[in-house]
């Protein structure tokens, strides 16, 4: 799958260079003009995306945790507060670069807490035909963790590729599918891959409101865990100005399984997150 993603990325990048002139004339009359559409890239301008959220995590086997406080040597049954700021610059209207800074404060009930800082740089490009929209992107995230009761989590690097394709499936309805691939390196010699497949609908019931609803299936290759999650996604935006939108997004893990052995072993079913964000274009 990694080779397929890489080949697709290079092929679509070459095609996009030929398609950009055609896009410029049609962009104002397509769903791409909707700044909340997942394919939207601002034309020769900036977009700021500010997010703050709360989440309940049932299992993250890649995070080391004190055994006395969790019952396992990894993170279980915790809640977190997250905040991030992402700045995107649209270079041509179909190609953009972006960078973000994020902070995550995580605490297990009745136990101590730890925090994490993230830095991300990336790029994305749209390849557009008459009916289908296609976006490819790549980014790298570096994460730094504080100690948790003398338990250390190594700094990690997450290299991410994605491919997204969508088309209008009805009046005011835009359907899309997304494939994500991550390869995560941490510690001196530890590494695992993760994959996500998402199917969703972007709905525009009015000129000022939009909504997204979908499902995501994800799995990883982390040794000893190999988690598999099915997650329900729901979100909505209200455009308060032509260049500003307020959003509320939520997700909930409907089903989860893994290869962790033992009676009553944990999984991620029932995990959820709720996030508020503001998009501002300038």
Segments (PLM) and residue ranges:
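Surface-exposed strand-loop-strand hairpins of Gram-negative outer-membrane beta-barrel proteins
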Residues: 54-83, 107-113, 256-264
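Outer-membrane beta-barrel architecture
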Residues: 38, 49, 86, 122-124, ...
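Transmembrane beta-barrel strands of outer-membrane/channel proteins
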Residues: 50-56, 99-103, 136-142, 177-181, ...
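Hydrophobic h-region of N-terminal signal peptides that target proteins for export
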Residues: 10-17
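Outer-membrane beta-barrel "beta-signal"
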Residues: 238, 252, 268-282
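Outer-membrane beta-barrel biogenesis signature
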Residues: 19-59, 202-209
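Repeated loop/turn-to-beta-strand initiation elements of outer-membrane beta-barrel proteins
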Residues: 46, 59, 93-99, 129-136, ...
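Outer-membrane pore/translocation modules
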Residues: 97-193, 199
């Amino acid at each position: 799958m990694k080779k397929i993603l890489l080949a697709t990325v290079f092929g679509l990048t070459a095609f996009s260079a030929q398609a950009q002139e055609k896009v410029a004339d049609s962009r104002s009359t397509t769903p791409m003009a909707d700044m909340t559409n997942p394919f939207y890239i601002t034309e020769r301008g900036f977009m700021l995306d500010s997010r703050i959220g709360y989440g309940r995590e049932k299992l993250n086997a890649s995070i080391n945790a004190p055994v006395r406080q969790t019952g396992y040597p990894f993170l279980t049954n915790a809640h977190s507060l997250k905040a991030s700021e992402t700045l995107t610059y649209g270079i041509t209207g179909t190609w953009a670069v972006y960078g973000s800074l994020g902070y995550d404060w995580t605490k297990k009930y009745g136990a101590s807490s730890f925090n994490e800082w993230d830095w991300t740089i990336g790029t994305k490009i749209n390849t557009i035909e008459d009916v289908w929209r296609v976006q490819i992107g790549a980014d790298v995230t570096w994460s730094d963790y504080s100690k948790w009761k003398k338990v250390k989590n190594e700094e990690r690097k997450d290299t991410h590729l994605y491919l997204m394709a969508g088309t209008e499936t009805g009046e005011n309805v835009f359907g899309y599918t997304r494939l994500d691939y991550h390869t995560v390196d941490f510690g001196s010699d530890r590494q695992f891959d993760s994959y996500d497949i998402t199917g969703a609908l972007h709905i525009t019931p009015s000129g000022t409101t939009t909504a997204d609803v979908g499902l995501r299936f994800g799995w990883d290759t982390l040794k000893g865990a190999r988690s598999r999650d099915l997650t329900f996604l729901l979100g909505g935006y209200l455009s308060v100005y032509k260049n500003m939108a307020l959003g509320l997004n939520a997700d909930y893990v409907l089903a989860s399984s893994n290869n962790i052995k033992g009676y009553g072993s944990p999984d991620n079913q029932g995990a959820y997150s709720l996030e508020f964000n503001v998009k501002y274009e300038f």
